[in-house]
Amino acid sequence: MNRQRVAVLALAAALGWAGAGSAAAQPVRQQLPGGLTVLVRENTATAVTAASLFVRMGSRWETEDDAGISHLLQQVVLKGTEGRSALEIAETAENLGGGIGASADLDYSEIRATALARNWRTMLELIADVALRPTLPTAEVDGERRATLTALRSRQDQPFSLAMDTLMSRVYGDHPYGRPILGRPAALERIDRARLVAHHQRFYRAPRMILAVSGDIDTRLVMAEVARLFADAPTGPAVGEPTLPEAAARADRTVIVRASAQAQVLAGFLAPPTSHADYAAVKVLATALGGGMAARLFTEVRDKQGLAYVTGGAYPSREGPGVLFTQLGTAPANQARAEAAMLGELDRIRREPVSPAELARAKGYLLGQFALDRRTNARLSWYDAFFEALRVGPGFAERYVRAVEAVTVEDVLRVARTYLSTPTVVTLGPGAQ
């Protein structure tokens, strides 16, 4: 066993990867009679307790007509409940020694909170109040709509954000993953309070909710309190899965001519969902290409050729079709050469296997980052709810670690040849062509 692997496994043990007898090894999962899924993880390592309430509501269930409605709803749920004003919600969270927030994403929406462990009951009551009894004041809806429209316009003025939004649109086509989570301006202009209320009533139902709690807590007491707090949560009718257009890989190149001190070059490829058997191997592939300062793009394009200021690559986890993308920022004068160099590395990793040293580095970096990201109860509860929402279930974190450890040089070459054959390229800069 090489020293890098020993170091990675030592870090894993130190940071509490499951399977090593840690008190936080596995959450207890229970589905309440109304359909709410509860995951409780006892972790005595810190005095802070955290909870994440996930709702299966997000861009995946939206259309062009209501694109952005989930994000808008999540911005307004904290603006008041039947028993608390927006200020009282914020003050209650602060008095618990923590905070509360809400957001939306492609496959889920979340209400999250943290508190000192002794205040866990009030923390859960606050989450339930916000989730089940928001008032969604008209003035707040209007204000958050304006703020979201401003944010969308701002993204058009940010070169990287504009290039990334364009890449996702070109990779996914008409699939909802191709739209910004913030939505579309035309759709947002049509969304009023009545539509937000209807959206909340449709999606904030017990069978669509996942509540994960992590901290110095007693599982039995938490389960009983959650059952009490969510006893009146609506249960039906069920919301069916959306009929989504197929995302089909296609070679494509988009040029955006835009004044910018730094040119952007991005390449994207359709990739498998998180539940796919190739998930771990594609994660390693993406890390070998763009993860950290020893990755291919950093060493070959930035260090050796001097053609980039920044490089990167990622493969975000999705319930539906994923995307593997690579990115670099460069001087406008080097844009064409930088694009050719990046595409050359993407082609090379399809033709030539990575070395055993590259494989070990990529796996070590990937697993080390994963361990570091799971050090706090806030992140542990988020991951527990996230993996449940993506339908890969309890224990996925441990299965994922084992799957990454098992990835071989041959696996990386195979998935590179499978998924990197049809690049979608976006290039942005003052002299882009």
List each language-model region with its residue ranges.
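Positively charged n-region of N-terminal signal peptides that target proteins for export
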Residues: M1-R5
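Bacterial N-terminal signal peptides
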Residues: A7-A18
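Boundary at the C-terminal end of the N-terminal hydrophobic targeting segment
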Residues: A18-A25
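Mature N-terminal segment immediately following signal peptide/propeptide cleavage
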Residues: A25-F54
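Charge-rich, well-structured scaffold segments of protease-associated domains
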Residues: Q31, E88-A238, V255, P273, ...
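M16/MPP (pitrilysin/insulinase) zinc-metallopeptidase core fold and M16-derived inactive scaffolds
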Residues: A50-A117, P180, G292-L307
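His/Glu-based metal-binding/catalytic segments typifying zinc-dependent metallopeptidases
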Residues: A238-A294
